[in-house]
């Protein structure tokens, strides 16, 4: 993705794996686990209270805010684990349909991207936040989630990806086009709101003395 490449321009291969290693170490801290649990609970609560189901295939929510805070504090590995856990627990506590692993993968990928982009950064600029959210919007929300909706309510399983049937793929793309427009409009409307909100929220959190000292532990990187 062009978007994510732009925010990772100055990142070396060693730095990438170092971030993964440091994020994984967060699970060894009791304070980190407690904070993760609190942010996970907040994400679930916001998901139950603020989510608006517009249509069967379209809903609006604000879980992005506790999600990005958690990812900034604990990194890509923790972000992916928390994303998957939140999706599964949310479905268990408030079922909205059958379990579908594609949506869990969406939450994990989004958490990984947020965590990698925001974790232990010396600065969180508006450009970094905007490009990160653009990456998640295009890759996860528009491409991946739309594909899962087509599979869940179309071919019913993942066999499509192993099929050479032209008719099956034509049916998939027809459904994809049918629901893509509405999802694109929704994401285009929410993108500036989410970007502005996440930028100011994360930078406000970074100014909290206790959290500022916590994030300095182990150092920051550009």
Per-range role (PLM):
Residues 2-222:
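Loop-helix junctions at membrane interfaces
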